[in-house]
């Protein structure tokens, strides 16, 4: 019924991918033995999780813990729990059967109950009943028969702060992600003011990974907050794994409003990832050639202007409706590659949901990255 809504997470697209799996070319045995870790938040990370699982890769996720909006924000404020929302989404993405009734119920959102999801309530209740958030995660992973593990990057209750490109300071993830101008930098602090402590199993998963995937998802409020936890960047550096950054298709919020793909890359390097990114996957409807900027195929339907621009003159209603494709030019591609990464450009847009990655295109791109990684290592 309408009272029980499944939380959206590209469910239909990845159901189609699951149905097509018997007819898709699998990875060889060596590739399926690879360990991958996805670093991100609750919207983009599940996309990479489902894609990697469809390839048979052993997959874990390290998840940002700065969420303070919506259902999670209410639970944090009123029950002082560890933020469950992004972890819940990644657990659901790990489920062996997305159509299992328990897995579907785990994603139900109740509009009549302050928009809480069952999964959020379960994680928060189990954190109290079992005595720890990691134990709550482990119980929920068993309930949905998760095919991998989800690790919070920290167990500390952290607050994200941001500085916009026009110099304003914003406190809170929910505020920062809807900024009216692009963000310049972000930082974390624990609620008692000290630096947050890393969750050691998350660091270990990163160190053991053969492939580390950043994104897709919100750059400053989902991906980078993980990198701000002491020890995470060092774990990436210590890993023998290749690092893939999956750039978002579009900015449908405000935090990266008007930023190009090159500026997304530069934001990562400014937050500790200089020299650590091996591959960058970007959307390009057409092959990148000299002096030919590429944009999302949804530019026409969004009406978005593609030049670098500020949105300080937009009101909230305009900001909410805006969808700005993330563009990349041939010159930007060369500039990125001059700093180390191989840029892989593909048409990645899902025709049915133009602001989502096509699971089939993403799967094919991931296969190629795995092959490239093995070739470079041998």
Language model features: what each stretch is:
Residues 1-3, 7, 66-182, 365-367, ...:
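Electropositive, gly/pro-rich neighborhoods at or near active sites that engage anionic ligands
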Residues 57, 239-243, 340-341:
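A short helix->loop->beta-strand "cap" motif at the edges of active sites that frequently abuts
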Residues 43-49, 221-228:
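Short glycine/serine/threonine-rich phosphate/pyrophosphate-binding segments
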Residues 156-220:
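Active-site gating loop/helix substructures
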Residues 60-66, 241-249, 278-287:
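Short internal beta-strands
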Residues 17-85:
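Gly/lys/ser-thr-rich phosphate-binding loops in alpha/beta enzymes
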Residues 226-233, 259-264:
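Charged helix-capping and loop-helix junction motifs
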